[in-house]
Amino acid sequence: MAEITATVRPTREEVVPSRKRVKLPAWLEVAKPRLIPLLLATTLGGMALSEGWPLSSPRLVCTLGGGALASAAAGVLNCLWEQDLDGRMARTSGRALPSGRLSPTSAFIGAIACTLAAAMLLVSGVNCLAAGLSLLGLCSYVLLYTALLKPRTSQNIVIGGVAGAIPPLVGAAAATGHVGLGGWWLFALVMVWTPAHFWALALLLREDYRAVGIPMLPVVKGPVVTARAIKTYGWITVLLSSLGVFALPSGGAFYGVMLLPYNARLLQLVDRLSLDPDSLVNAKALFRWSILYLFGVCLLLILSRTDLASGFTHQVIQLLSLPTGVH
């Protein structure tokens, strides 16, 4: 008798194990707290790229606190908008809103409260530009991505990724009162990083998206085209990330050297996926590494502004300026 095997696609809980281990209270679950640390990391990256780094402790706390509150508000509003959609999928039907563990009214009040608190904290403790950019990020996530693009186009995350790319601008604005070249560079980097990151997850969950009619790229074009697109954006990410050497006010050489293994690993994983687009193992590995990659880039930006990194850069410049003896 022929043995029949079926491909069992992982759930989101299997892709991100922490979701399975920790059961959050309903009011906290809808705020999507697991997304906040990476957004705050890119906010810190935007600060580190500015001449105003390091910030005073009160300004730093207000910036990160306001950003966390704005992100929480965006998460709640996203859950409110998609509660009917979540209720139609087995994977998400147990979430707080579709399961009835939290009422829509309570969630909406919480979202408004977080939005107002974020605005007040950023205006009073940072500046109006940082507050305005933070609210722009909230609105772009809920209105541009969730409501307009996600249900209509397979390029939803390419355009809608602007929402996740705004925190570096908030960080830069908090540090100097304006958005300089470094802030815009990190904004662009997050924009081009987002498609490869999200499409890797969408490859794992494409049957869920297909079942409810969400036109994610793996659903519309299939894994081969998606893997090819991921490889393209992966290379763009690597090339653009290398320009951070010039975006940093100091410590660029340190950043450039330490970035090499991060980029090498990213290229290795996108290449593996392009060779075997149907591999769930490869898609999962890329998704997980992409998160660590962006955390790593932001950490390198911060470390590059230390005295140790500046000394390293100075030594590199001295070595490059030594006479070669060739005339």
Curated annotation (Swiss-Prot):
Enzyme Commission code: 2.5.1.141
Annotated GO MF terms: protoheme IX farnesyltransferase activity
Catalytic activity entry: heme b + (2E,6E)-farnesyl diphosphate + H2O = Fe(II)-heme o + diphosphate
Pfam families linked to this entry: UbiA
Root EC class: transferase
InterPro entries listed in its UniProt record: Protohaem_IX_farnesylTrfase, UbiA_prenyltransferase, UbiA_prenylTrfase_CS, UbiA_sf
Subcellular localization, as worded in the UniProt entry: Cell inner membrane
GO biological process terms on file: heme O biosynthetic process
Pathway entry: Porphyrin-containing compound metabolism; heme O biosynthesis; heme O from protoheme: step 1/1
Segments passing through the bilayer: 35-55, 60-80, 106-126, 129-149, 157-177, 185-205, 234-254, 283-303
Residues of the signal peptide: none
Membrane topology, record value: Multi-pass membrane protein
Keywords: Cell inner membrane, Cell membrane, Heme biosynthesis, Membrane, Transferase, Transmembrane, Transmembrane helix
Keyword ATP-binding annotated: no
Organism superkingdom: Bacteria
Main subcellular location: membrane
Record-level GO cellular component terms: plasma membrane
Similarity comment text for this entry: Belongs to the UbiA prenyltransferase family. Protoheme IX farnesyltransferase subfamily.
Something else known: Carbon 2 of the heme B porphyrin ring is defined according to the Fischer nomenclature.
PANTHER family xrefs: 4-HYDROXYBENZOATE SOLANESYLTRANSFERASE (PTHR43448:SF7), PROTOHEME IX FARNESYLTRANSFERASE, MITOCHONDRIAL (PTHR43448)
Purpose of the protein: Converts heme B (protoheme IX) to heme O by substitution of the vinyl group on carbon 2 of heme B porphyrin ring with a hydroxyethyl farnesyl side group.
Name of the protein in its database record: Protoheme IX farnesyltransferase
